[in-house]
Design a protein with these regions (language model features):
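Active-site loop/helix belt of alpha/beta enzymes
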Residues: 1-49
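A generic structural signal for short, solvent-exposed coil/turn residues
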Residues: 3-5, 55, 105, 119
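A residue-level signal for beta-strand positions that form part of recognition/binding surfaces
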Residues: 30-32, 60, 70, 124
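A general, composition-driven signal for non-globular sequence regions
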Residues: 46, 59, 110-114
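Intrinsically disordered, low-complexity segments enriched in polar/charged residues with Gly/Pro
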Residues: 49-51, 103-104
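Short coil-to-beta-strand transition motifs
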Residues: 53-60
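C-terminal accessory subdomain/extension
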Residues: 68-175
């Protein structure tokens, strides 16, 4: 742009900003890095390296129905390139089963996942994958206090980041 007479004062670089590549943003003249998945520790770099950043998001759903000895659960906000392989399913944390997931078709965004196991309807599903929250009808629940083993729900947001509920110290039930 400078070559054609347009002065650039700010250069916002694309997503996947992380501690690993922020030095390159600076070296390339970038003044901003899109936070995106760096806030949740779910950049492609984080799938193999947790030295500097740890994933800070989990996906919670429930088994909605069964068909032909397989279970299905809602997967709103799934990012089709995330490579989900397994989820944990069950009623109690000490009895969760690791279940293989059949990823949905690439052209879907809010849909049901198929789990290769017949679980109980209503069982909790816990997954970890790269999300696209802004294109879903799902909510985001902020939980604080995990570092101190005292989790509390502090707020619920819609997919556009608007606050739906704000809580003061609601304790998470830990069975």
């Amino acid at each position: 742009m400078n070559d054609i007479g347009i002065e650039i004062e700010q250069l916002n670089m694309p997503s996947i900003t992380s501690l690993e590549n922020i030095k390159y943003i600076k070296a390339l003249g970038g003044t901003y890095g899109e936070p995106g998945h760096s806030l949740t520790g779910t950049t492609p770099f984080n799938s193999r390296n947790f030295k500097q950043e740890k994933p800070a998001i989990i996906y919670i759903s429930e088994i909605s129905h069964n068909l032909n000895n397989k279970s299905y659960f809602y997967g709103g906000g799934y990012y089709r390139r995330s490579g989900i392989k397994n989820v944990l399913v069950g009623k109690y944390t000490d009895k969760l089963k690791q279940i293989e997931v059949v990823p949905p078709q690439l052209d879907n965004i809010d849909y049901y996942f198929e789990a290769k196991y017949k679980a109980n309807i209503g069982d909790t599903v816990i997954g970890a994958f790269r999300t696209q929250i802004f294109v879903t009808r799902s909510d985001v629940v902020l939980i604080e206090g995990l570092k101190y083993d005292r989790p509390i729900i502090s707020a619920v947001y819609d997919s556009l980041g608007r606050i739906k509920y704000k809580y003061k110290g609601v304790k998470v039930k830990n069975e």
